Design a protein with these regions (language model features):
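Asp/Glu-rich intrinsically disordered low-complexity tracts
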Residues: 436-444, 454, 461-480, 484-490
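Conserved N-terminal catalytic/coupling substructures associated with nucleotide/phosphate chemistry
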Residues: 1-319, 328-441, 450-453
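Active-site alpha-helix of zinc metalloproteases
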Residues: 325
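Conserved N-box helix within the HATPase_c
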Residues: 322
Length: 490
């Protein structure tokens, strides 16, 4: 299921709403954030599955007292408002259960459970927020692998072991990439990659004391090699191997990892992409190599106005910085331990799209408001920052938003797919004026006047309008291969 910034409808359900308002929501049918249950005389056990599912996904509302007739296709006829017989007792029973041992944690406040009534019909609403990543998973019973649920358009489903493991890992304040990989040593480091990194490091940090260290000691300082003081184990960390390792050891330990860059700037019916970088046996497919091979190609067509700072030429703009920042964010926030870890960049004439494995730690609307969480891979973040790539912690996405706003472009679109467990950031270089012009166009009368070149804005219209509508309600928010067969993992 995809989530974007405007996914806040379930938070509109409150104790002050009218019966007719709630009825309208019910008549639109169940959705990823709305679950209806009959619940005539007691709280159904399935309520706690939905509670877990909403808390572990994007939040939502459970409405008790609604019967579903699955034979009817029209939602207005499918969902019948029957009401509950004793709402006071039902609410009391729910609170007693949720605060007992039924679930591992109660995340609700008093105002999250309320009744909405009219005449002789009373419905009970349970509003479940998305839980903090430091507290997930929320599960039934005492076994997270049996009692953890997530949510999609079809309802609640048992979370996979990979999804549960991912939630448990996200609770670790130290991140993922400090994990010592047993039996992986300095022999698994690609010397050329590390040498290239150290050369950049020395140029940027000319008098740094680390420049005199041997490779092992240097990696120790960066978090790429570690010794566990408790048991004496030592070896490469996940950060060290993924950033600087040889391709074969990486593919052995992380067979789930797939890196893919595609340029779709010049495409035809027969050619899906005009340039591509993915593993082809000609380069050691570690993250630093991927970053340094892709970045020049990704930025090659951007305008570079001639400017001087003193006698030094400045040949990149804030847009270059924002796109590179998006690349860094993709690397440092990725969950490389998911069952499918795809790092994908798609370049088009007017957009860049970055996809990484793992769900967001924070709700999307919080991220747009400036909220930030620690990256999953803080050592990788340090490695990139020490050679000039990546802003300080928490400032990357706000910087991208500010730069796109300064250029008058459509708001960057951050999307979370909680079924594929991946996040996508799309940076579209189309002006808001173009979006508004298309939106105001009378398609029936002026269809022929709209040129094919302008049709490129169609795909961002809905996204932009959704984001704009939310801003009105929330003003405070401020190997390089050519045309070969595609081997996408999807």
């Amino acid at each position: 299921m995809y989530y974007t910034y405007n996914n806040k409808k379930h938070f509109e359900l409150s104790s002050g709403m009218s019966f007719e308002e709630l009825k309208d929501i019910i008549c639109n049918g169940e959705k990823v954030d709305i679950e209806c249950k009959e619940a005539g005389a007691g709280v159904p056990l399935s309520v706690y599955e939905s509670y877990s599912g909403f808390a572990n996904t994007q939040g939502g509302c459970i409405i008790l007292g609604v019967k579903e007739d699955k034979k009817k296709a029209d939602p207005a006829e499918r969902f019948l408002l029957k009401g509950v017989t004793d709402p006071g007792k039902m609410i009391e029973d729910f609170w007693n259960t949720i605060n007992g041992n039924k679930v591992n944690v109660s995340i609700l406040k008093d105002e999250d459970v309320f009744k909405v009534e009219r005449d002789d019909i009373c419905l009970v609403v349970i509003r479940v927020p998305r839980d903090d990543y430091k507290q997930r998973p929320v599960y039934i019973g005492d076994n997270p692998y049996k009692g953890t649920f997530k949510r999609n358009n079809d309802g609640d489903y048992h979370a996979t072991s990979y999804e549960v493991d991912g939630m448990i890992r996200d609770k670790n304040p130290d991140g993922d990439d400090g994990l010592i990989l047993e039996y992986f040593t300095m022999d698994d480091i690609d010397q050329e990659t590390l040498r290239n990194y150290r050369q950049i490091f020395e140029v940027r940090n000319e008098n740094h004391v680390w420049n005199k260290l041997d490779n092992k000691s240097f990696l120790e300082q960066l978090g790429g090699y570690r010794t566990d003081r408790r048991d004496g184990r030592e070896g490469l960390t996940m950060a060290g191997l993924l950033m600087f390792g040889k391709g074969l050891p990486i593919r052995t330990e992380f067979s789930n990892l797939f890196m893919d860059y595609r340029s779709e700037v010049v495409v035809t019916d027969d050619v899906r992409w005009d340039d591509r970088i993915t593993y082809d046996g000609t380069w050691e497919n570690n993250l630093f190599n991927f970053f340094t091979k892709v970045t020049p190609k990704m930025l090659a067509d951007l305008k570079k106005p001639f400017r001087l700072a003193g006698i030094q030429r400045i040949d990149e703009t804030s847009v270059h910085k924002a796109i590179r920042e998006a690349f860094v964010n993709m690397i440092i926030h990725a969950d490389y331990l998911m069952d499918s870890a795809v790092l994908k960049i798609i370049k088009k004439p007017d957009s860049f799209e970055f996809t990484n494995p793992g769900v967001l730690k924070l709700p999307i609307d919080d991220i747009y408001r400036g909220g930030n969480s620690k990256s999953r891979n803080p050592h990788m973040q340090t490695m990139l920052r020490m050679v000039g790539f990546g802003d300080n912690a928490g400032s990357g996405f706000p910087s991208i938003l500010a730069i796109w706003n300064d250029n008058g472009w459509a708001i960057p679109r951050l999307t979370e797919d909680t079924q594929l467990n991946q996040v996508t950031l799309k940076l579209t270089m189309i002006s808001i004026d173009e979006v508004n012009a298309f939106n105001n166009l009378d398609s029936n009368k002026e269809e022929s006047k709209w040129s094919n070149s302008n049709r490129r804005v169609e795909k961002v219209i809905i996204d932009q309008n959704d984001l704009d509508n939310d801003q009105e309600n929330d003003p405070g928010r401020a190997s390089d291969n050519k045309s070969e067969p595609d081997n996408d993992p999807e």
